């Protein structure tokens, strides 16, 4: 998860947006319920100070969507929500979840090759894989 936070900070920096620790809410787990609770805590602490939520897992984002709707937000007009993983359920939630889809099949193949390498006493290596943004209904540009 550390790399996802670093990626978030890098994206903010590239966009000229200052990083604000107060806008970070750590969920207790990766469950939908944890996403729901994390959004409630963030909204109570910082309501009105943000127009988007980026959750480090789709399950957390789905919980955020539910809590935001119950808090009176119009999605995505008032608030955009984006997840990370690309789970199938996100496409069927309302609004459908914009997400960062990971290449799971390729990841599995590479994990097998890396494990074989470790068994053959090869050096451990770190890989960063390209991901794909899947645009759906939970995100919009402000004013649209």
Feature map (PLM): residue ranges:
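Bacterial carbohydrate/catabolite-sensing allosteric modules
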Residues: 1-144
């Amino acid at each position: 998860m550390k790399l996802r936070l670093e990626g978030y900070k890098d994206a903010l920096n590239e966009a000229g947006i200052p990083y604000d620790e107060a806008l970070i809410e750590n969920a207790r787990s990766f469950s939908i319920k944890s996403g729901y609770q994390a959004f409630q805590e963030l909204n109570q602490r910082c309501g009105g100070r943000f127009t988007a939520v980026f959750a480090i897992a789709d399950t957390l984002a789905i919980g955020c969507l539910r809590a935001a709707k119950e808090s009176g937000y119009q999605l995505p007009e008032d608030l955009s929500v984006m997840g990370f993983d690309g789970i199938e359920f996100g496409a069927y939630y309302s609004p459908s979840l914009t997400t960062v889809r990971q290449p799971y099949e390729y990841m599995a193949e590479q994990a097998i090759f890396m494990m074989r390498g470790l068994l053959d006493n090869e050096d451990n290596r770190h890989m960063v894989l390209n991901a794909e943004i899947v645009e759906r209904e939970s995100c919009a540009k402000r004013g649209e």
